[in-house]
Structures are given as structure tokens and as C-alpha cells.
Amino acid sequence: MTKEPFKTKYGQGSKVCKRCGRKGPGIIRKYGLDLCRQCFRELAPKLGFKKYD
């Protein structure tokens, strides 16, 4: 019998991007987005976020 991998219940390893599945410290969870920063940069204009100088 093989053991199942340990699932993290809390911390950075438990947060995953809804779009690509990345884990780690670059997850944006504000407003329930749950996107990594790379996916957020691609989707931000479609979501209505504007970039100000």
C-alpha cells in the first residue's frame, strides 16, 4: 500500500491559483480572486482593474 501525499491545511502551500494551479506566496486572494500574480496580470483588464501611473 502506498501512502497519500500530505495535504497542507494552512499556510502558503494550501493556497492554489484557480486558473493554473500554482502554489506559493504569489497568490492574490483579495475579493475572492484566488489567482497567482501572473494570471492576475493577464486577467486584470478584463476584470475591470486599471493600472495608474
From Swiss-Prot:
User: Which keywords label this protein?
Assistant: Metal-binding, Ribonucleoprotein, Ribosomal protein, RNA-binding, rRNA-binding, Zinc
Keyword Ribosomal protein found: yes
The cross-references to PROSITE patterns, in alphabetical order and at most eight, read: RIBOSOMAL_S14 (PS00527)
Cofactor annotation comment: Binds 1 zinc ion per subunit.
Its gene name is: rps14
Which Pfam families does the UniProt entry name for this protein?
A: Ribosomal_S14 (PF00253)
Give me the residues that bind Zn(2+), please: 17, 20, 36, 39
What does the function comment of this entry state? Binds 16S rRNA, required for the assembly of 30S particles.
What family does the Swiss-Prot or TrEMBL record give for this protein? Belongs to the universal ribosomal protein uS14 family. Zinc-binding uS14 subfamily.
Look up keyword Transcription and say if it applies.
Answer: no
Q: Which Gene Ontology BP terms does the record give?
A: cytoplasmic translation
Give the quaternary structure: Part of the 30S ribosomal subunit.
- Top-rank lineage group of the source organism: Archaea
GO terms for cellular component: cytosolic small ribosomal subunit
Q: Which cofactor does it need?
A: Zn(2+)
What name does the UniProt record give this protein? Small ribosomal subunit protein uS14
Q: Identify the taxonomic lineage of the organism of origin.
A: Archaea, Methanobacteriati, Methanobacteriota, Methanomada group, Methanococci
Extract the GO molecular function terms from the UniProt entry: rRNA binding; structural constituent of ribosome; zinc ion binding
